[in-house]
Each structure stands twice: as C-alpha cells, then as structure tokens.
Amino acid sequence: MTGQPYLDLPRARQARGQVALPGSKSISNRVLLLAALAAGRTDISGLLDSDDTRVMLAALRQLGVELAEAGEGRVTVGGAGRFPVKQADLFLGNAGTAFRPLTAALALMGGQYRLSGVPRMHERPIGDLVDALRQWGARIDYLGQAGYPPLAVGEGRIRADAPARVQGAVSSQFLTALLLAAPVLAQGSDRPVVIEVAGELISKPYIEITLNLMARYGVQVRRDGWRTFTIEPGAAYRSPGAIAVEGDASSASYFLALGAIGGGPVRVTGVGADSIQGDVAFARTLADMGVQIDYGPDWIEARGVRVDQGGRLKAFDTDFNLIPDAAMTAAALALYADGPCRLRNIGSWRVKETDRIHAMHTELAKLGAEVESGPDWLRITPPADGGWRDAHIGTWDDHRMAMCFSLAAFGPAAVRILDPGCVSKTFPDYFDVYAGLVSGAPDSYDD
C-alpha cells in the first residue's frame, strides 16, 4: 500500500473474527537494543516488521552488531556489550523508540556519531534527554535548533558522580533511554548509577515495560516510587538466550474498537491478562463504555453495540495519561457515543509523530463532530443525526491517525483515507486485516 495516495473505505456495518497481532513496537525496539548491549547471543521471535524496527536494525548493523534475520519475526543478535563501530552517521527516520535510546547508549559509550531523521523527527524535542546525559559527562551538540535533533555525539568524560535528573512530563522515552543505557555506565563504575525524575512522570506503563525487559536481561532496577531509579555498580546485561515479543497492545485497540461498534465478537491474540503492556488497559475503557470484554492469558475479546442499527457507546470523561497511544482510538470512538466525550491529560500527543491533538481535532471536525481542544485535552460531541459529512481524512504522516479513522467507516458518510501507506511505521498490512473483519454494504453510503 506504500505510495497509494488514498483509500476509499466501504461502508461498514458489522465486525467479527480473530486477529493475531503483530509484535509490539515498544517491546521490539527495546529488545533489539538490549540484545545488542548484552553479552551472548539472543534469539528473538515475534519481532515487529515495520519502518521503526527496520530503522533500529539498520542502525545496529551500522554500529557493527551481528544480526541474522530468519524471516517471520525471527532475528538472532550477537551482543558484545558495546558497539564495535566508533564512528557512524545514523539516519533514524521518525522512530523515537530508536532515536532516544540510541542517543543515550552512544553518548555513554563514546565515539563520533551523527544522529538525524526526517523533518518531523527534527521537530520532536530531545533537550531533556540531552540535559540529563550531560550531567553524566556526555558530549552532545545540537546541529540545528537547540533542544532538537539532529545531534552530534562525541567523546565525553563519563562518570556517575551524581544522579542524572530528567523531566518526566514531556515523554517517558527520555527516562526509558536513560534506563536502557545506564548499565553501560554501571559496568565501569564503583558507585550506583542514579536517575531522578523531576515533575510528573507521564506514560508510566511504558517505564514498566522497560524495567521488565531489563530484568529479563539480568539487570534489576531499584526504584523509589516514580522519582528515583538506581542501578547497582557492575550491573551488566546478559542474554536470556531466547525472548518472544508480545503482540502490540496499541494495535489491539483498533480491533477491539471494531468489536465495540460492529457488534463483535472480535478477539485479538498475542496480548491478554498476562501482558506487560499498559495499553491493555484500553479494554477497561471499552468496558466503561458499555462493551463486554473477556480475557484469557494471551487474548482479549470485545462484544459491543451495532452502531449501524442505532446502538451507542456510553460517553466518557477520562484521564488518558497512562495510555496516550490507545487514547487516540477512544477519540475516534467518541463519534459513536451517546453524548460529549472528554479526553484529559494527553499533552504528550503534541510531540508525537505529529501534533495529534491538532490533527485529531481537525479530522473529527471534518466528519461533523463538534470539537474543542486545549493544551492537553479534547472534547468531542458526536455528529447529530443527519450531521455526518463525507470527508477526506488527512493522516498527517501518522500511522495511528490512519488506523483510528478506519473506524469512521461505520458512520453514514463516505470516508477516504489519504496516504494510507503511513501505517507501514508499525502495521504495514493493517487495512488488509481490517477488511478481513469488517462486513457491510460496499460502495453504498445510503442508510
């Protein structure tokens, strides 16, 4: 679908079936970096095949890491604890899950590196991470606007004499980057490596993923609430031998949403009650909206209303600080609520692949919703009866915008998704999987 200018979505009426989820983006790129930094060989299964993971794989190859891809999400990584190549020019696209952690790891190892990305990556802030790394003696220079990529990383005087203090309110990826890289510093230190969080930490479930995976690779992090994180001197990553990547819980949200408005049942496999991903909590949000949710150890199932027959979801007023990615799916579902819906504490949307608050406001309004927004909130009043409007939905080069607005096909309007190929960032065949679950009246938009 890459390069296809638009996709016209047939009117959808019902959704049912089962989906085996692609691997988690958050877990995939963390596991790749951990395997590269660990002593020993790691056999990875279930790795996500997407733009973001390809960016990480390409960067690790440039840095001299031994990689063998066997297809179907299987990759073997030969880790050596440090990157063999000490000088490289890395292009990291718009992959924050690659750019931030690699910046931290390279800064603590030392060498001569240049890190850059697409124009949007150069608009995404990184100053809080750079400031924290400089407290450990890292040498990092901005090659453009201060506080933003591209970056030049040089040889610093690395030491753990004092804690690194990082702001927690902009992106949890800054803390994740520091945590993942901290054992590089701890290996040669005679004192603990300490990270302190200033302000409110957002997206805590993503930090839980990081800590869980670090433990799988032999490094235990001691934490005092969400304020202080300590890695003991001499800590070093060791390969677990083999590791399986869970299905992507953020991607699960779109299919569970289909079950919520298309009757269902829709079951996703690869995540469930035992998942380490915070976005599984989206299922509880659906339950609050009146959707029947059932769980197994590695599956979740949704049975909801038929909006094409007049069914409506319960309106919500929810703090989405912990699950900002899945919150986008909730915003799209607000089109089918029985009253105004409010999404709170979503300020991190402003610095994602696009300004998601502005983008979501713009595109929901095209469909006839009444939308208000602020620095960290959205208020959405569903289109009135007869108030839906045909729309060409801009995706803003944001994979999640494209996937969320596939849900608009259940409304009484013609929906065209522009640049549908942007889903390749995390889910290249999303629209094929979507089509396998949805049934309706193709090419007809009359009630």
Swiss-Prot record:
It is found in: Cytoplasm. It is an enzyme of class 2 (transferase). It comes from the Bacteria. GO terms for biological process: amino acid biosynthetic process; aromatic amino acid family biosynthetic process; chorismate biosynthetic process. Pfam families: EPSP_synthase. GO terms for molecular function: 3-phosphoshikimate 1-carboxyvinyltransferase activity. 3-phosphoshikimate binds at K25, S26, R30, S171, S172, Q173, S203, D325, K352. Keywords: Amino-acid biosynthesis, Aromatic amino acid biosynthesis, Cytoplasm, Transferase. It catalyses: 3-phosphoshikimate + phosphoenolpyruvate = 5-O-(1-carboxyvinyl)-3-phosphoshikimate + phosphate. GO terms for cellular component: cytoplasm. Pathway: Metabolic intermediate biosynthesis; chorismate biosynthesis; chorismate from D-erythrose 4-phosphate and phosphoenolpyruvate: step 6/7. Phosphoenolpyruvate binds at K25, G96, R124, Q173, R356, R400, K425. Catalyzes the transfer of the enolpyruvyl moiety of phosphoenolpyruvate (PEP) to the 5-hydroxyl of shikimate-3-phosphate (S3P) to produce enolpyruvyl shikimate-3-phosphate and inorganic phosphate. This is 3-phosphoshikimate 1-carboxyvinyltransferase.
